[in-house]
Amino acid sequence: MKRKYPYSLAKGLTSTQIAVIVAVIVIVIIIGVVAGFVLTKGPSTTAVTTTVTSTFTTTTTIPSTTTSTPSNTVVFYTWWGGGDGGEALSQIIPAVKQYAGLQMQTYSIPGAGGTNAKYAILALIQAGKPPAAFQVHYGPEMISYVEAAPNGIHTFVNMTPYLIQWGLLNNAVYAVLQAGAYNGTLLSVPINVHRGAVLYVNTQLLREYNLPFPYNFSTLVYDTVQLANHGVSPWIIPGGDGGWDQFNVWEDIFLYLAGPQLYNELIYGTLNFSNPTVQKLINETNYWFLNFTSYNYPGWQSMSWEQAFALIAQGKVAFQANGNWVTNYASYINVTVYPPLPQYISNSSVSVVETPFPGTQHYYALVIDTIGIPVGPQEQQALQLAHFWSSYQGQEVWTKYKAVTYYKNGTDWYAQPAQWYDYQQLINTSEQNFVYQLSDGGVFDDVFAQIDSGLLTLQQVGKVGLSAWNSTLVSSMQQEQNEWLAAAKLGLGYLGFPGHPFAGYYPPWVTNPSAYGLTNNTQKTSNSVMLFLLPFLALPLAIASIDNKYYLLK
């Protein structure tokens, strides 16, 4: 399935386009419901009811959000459902009701990585009927909404003072907040941290053929060839998610070859494609991408990432590159996923291990789910929801089945052994070794769609498509840079806080703004800086009004 969006989120949409998008989203959702929901427990589709709980709904219409919504009800738009966050939602919804006194209505719009949900949310915002709260990634993704919204940044609640008040600036892993701060301004609230750039390995297959565990890239290549020689399909890289899985594989290979700084330059579109070293790295990445995809499981074209993991769990393939949301899905189908430690790799009863993509074990690819809150009639309820969900108490409930927490003093409350390993890696990774995963919020939404489409096509056609793919990559990165420059004019020109950029990297328009037609004022300051520097100043009455509940903060 090939998805391509010819318009840019950053450019805004006409009312006609909005209507078309809403109609398309509704049709997509109806198709998903008829098919038995987007998520399945394996390659064979099993129909499930569309209502997971009384408050968790796969919607077939776009519900309006108006002042008639009950005062204790909050509407949350998401792409989670079934195995991808469904279990965690079933736990957080009653907790929100018990501790925050809110009835949480969750509308799920299926699509890997938010492919469909992002456009439905945007359409509602542009139509002046935003949801009370919505799921959004950290990284530049949130700026896509800012640049397209009718009132720009003023469409959304500035969350910086709230996160200060709630203690996250002091108690969360700092890199997590840097990944969502735009020159010091935080526009959404983190609720979990996923790890991208991981590889799922069926260790029983490796034992059957006496093959070593792929701790490094050369071993991964060796295992791939040996498994193929034994008639086993080494890889499953599904195509049913529109190119998102291909993007995962390509970026993981690039991270191994190029390291974190050059990877983070892709976030800003500043990678120098004229540099011979960069050209060599891109060529090598393309080579290994085509190499691994040539060993793909038959029928990959129509499969989703969930169906792909079912093949891993069943021992039909050895490798799947993705993020650790797959580990949460494993809980849904009753599969235990273990970390890459010797006692598990050598254990004959262990079948699935999650490991950092070979060669990237010292890096941490962040994928951070957050809550965005539009200014509107349900703003206070949405703030109450975000307050509880982001609290230590809320994190114990939510991240048991979803990703890991960002609190620096968390304990092992997780459902899967691999989650605790990922959490320990998170709190012990050096600042310069973080990246923000490109395929899950690390690029603007229109760039994301272009790269997805380009890589899916490259896998389909092979080497003859390299020239077209390279052209797509270069033009996409130019678009990425242009959209960051537009953000810079709004004072949102980089990830991080003044003096503390994400991963220690400033894009060049921050260090040399005049070369990009910018002024120093648009780069070095933002309206939230004083709030960041002076957290003990009196805060707005709105904060006090939602701070009347105490949530456990250890």
Swiss-Prot record:
The chain crosses the membrane at residues 18-38, 526-546. It is found in: Cell membrane. Coiled coil: none annotated. It comes from the Archaea. GO terms for cellular component: plasma membrane. Residues 1-17, 547-554 are cytoplasmic. Binding of glucose is strongly inhibited by galactose and mannose. Its main location: membrane. Residues 39-525 are extracellular. The complex is composed of two ATP-binding proteins (GlcV), two transmembrane proteins (GlcT and GlcU) and a solute-binding protein (GlcS). PANTHER family: ARABINOSE-BINDING PROTEIN-RELATED, OSMOPROTECTIVE COMPOUNDS-BINDING PROTEIN GGTB. Belongs to the bacterial solute-binding protein 1 family. This is Glucose-binding protein GlcS. It comes from Saccharolobus solfataricus (strain ATCC 35092 / DSM 1617 / JCM 11322 / P2).
